[in-house]
Amino acid sequence: MFCTRGLVFFAFPAGLDIEFTGLRSNLSGPQQISLFDLPSEWYLKTRQSVQQFTICQIGLSVFSAIEGEANKYTAHSCNFYLFPTTFGILDSEFSFQASSVQFLNQYGFNYNKFLKNGIPYMNEEQEKKIRHDILTGNWRVRSSPDKDQIKVVIDEVTRWLDLAKEGDWMTLPGITGFQAFEVQLVLRQALPNIWTVLKDEGVVVKKVSKQHRWYLQNTSCDRESCWKENILLSARGFSAFFQMLVKAQKPLVGHNMMMDLLHLHEKFFRPLPESYDQFKQNIHSLFPVLIDTKSVTKDIWKEMNFPRVSNLSKVYEVLNSDLNPTKNSGPEIVHASRCEKYVETKCPHEAAYDAFLCGSVLLKVAHLLLQKVHRIDPVPESSFPQYLDVLAPYVNQVNLIRAGVPKINFSGPDYPGIRPPILILSVKRWPGVSEQQVCHKFQNLCKFDVRRLTRSQFLLLTNKFKDARNILKEYRGHPTLCISLYRYWRHSPNVNCLLQVCGIVTAWALLAFTLGRSGP
């Protein structure tokens, strides 16, 4: 992690990918995401899943230009296994989703590294709580296993103290990480005539006088306040790196990165707010330049008539094939020393590998766009600032999966995309039909999101124009299932109710007018 820190400030884009213990809660009915959802509705539904699951791996690939070589970049790719901080009052709860575990296991994910060696992290609110407890002396060990072990340690040290002389010392071997900090904190609080030091072989306990203890606490390089700050720094773990990434203000690149951004906010910044607009503002202040390669490749794929692909690895393969007219003139990317794992080895769904693919795809697609602008190949003296210029329409446009808009604009209002029209299904002779039954009825033909309009009417929405055309054609003239284009002024129950009320009022007014004229 430390070898990557300095590079972040000198890099151009930073590719990011995150793996989770689960993606989306198995919520039913109105809590499921839908093509009918406004972005704010989609956000509130997804927020629950983000709070339920956690990050198990983050991959970062930092791209830096090679000095003196035109359009040549070095990629520094790193994997970080993470595990929530368990320290003091912090004891997070999270879920595993069976399908996500199976998926990652299929690609060789090392769950032992996640569970045993994961780097701790916390968000700003958690840091404030633990900082207050440690600095005010209100810190307590909360974990039962830790309490048991620390009790054993205190008993051992107390027995040793009865026989030891001032200046004697003992070592508590095999105590590392947060446990070492906890042991030292408890021992220093409980025993006024000892001092502790953390060394490679374990925690060293030394018997000292109370005067010498006061001196060590207030004047040594390991004085109490500095030592507690070091505890906080270690407890923050990866969060310190996250804050440095924010401070660098470099373009952050991902692929279908919306879930990544939600988890970054929740796990490292602050708990996700209820307000969707506040979430957008927060993310934009953290990362002013976001580029989602899914949004970029969507458009360029149509223009170039590239073959349809289903994932990031396939996108990368197409851009490195002869199908790409700028294959030989595009940016050259080499792996840095000590980051050469991916030179010959493909590791799909390993976070650092996918992060490397994100950055590489961005550079290659940007070069393709630049060539289209200049209409010459090779483009003279291509550079990353030029790439950012041609990528401007895609900056802060993050792809949104299954919602009422195709993407979220983090630097302004969201714009409605071009989507297939809403269809209306009118059902005859099928009493008590449910939304699930309607979905099941059409599942062999195409996938629709279904929303009930009235007792016998349902709205149907798909993200493919072809599916909308097919179902209109297939069910034309059907005796019990009538499907047509939805027209708000014609089909909305609210509009129909309003028209009926207006009709009644008009009729009464006309009747009153008629009776008034025929009177004496």
Curated annotation (Swiss-Prot):
One of its GO terms (biological process) is nuclear-transcribed mRNA poly(A) tail shortening. Keywords: Endoplasmic reticulum, Exonuclease, Hydrolase, Magnesium, Membrane, Metal-binding, Nonsense-mediated mRNA decay, Nuclease, RNA-binding, Transmembrane, Transmembrane helix. The chain crosses the membrane at residues 497-513. It is a single-pass membrane protein. It catalyses: Exonucleolytic cleavage of poly(A) to 5'-AMP. Its main location: endoplasmic reticulum. Mg(2+) binds at D17, E19, D260, D354. It is found in: Endoplasmic reticulum membrane. GO terms for molecular function: metal ion binding; poly(A)-specific ribonuclease activity; RNA binding. GO terms for cellular component: endoplasmic reticulum; endoplasmic reticulum membrane; nucleus. Its cofactor is Mg(2+). InterPro entries: CAF1_poly(A)_ribonucleases, RNase_CAF1, RNaseH-like_sf, RNaseH_sf. The keyword Ribonucleoprotein does not apply. The keyword NADP does not apply. Its EC number is 3.1.13.4. Belongs to the CAF1 family. PANTHER family: POLY A -SPECIFIC RIBONUCLEASE/TARGET OF EGR1, MEMBER 1, POLY(A)-SPECIFIC RIBONUCLEASE PNLDC1. 3'-exoribonuclease that has a preference for poly(A) tails of mRNAs, thereby efficiently degrading poly(A) tails. Exonucleolytic degradation of the poly(A) tail is often the first step in the decay of eukaryotic mRNAs and is also used to silence certain maternal mRNAs translationally during oocyte maturation and early embryonic development. May act as a regulator of multipotency in embryonic stem cells. Is a critical factor for proper spermatogenesis, involved in pre-piRNAs processing to generate mature piRNAs. This is Poly(A)-specific ribonuclease PNLDC1. It comes from Pongo abelii (Sumatran orangutan). The lineage of its organism: Eukaryota, Metazoa, Chordata, Craniata, Vertebrata.
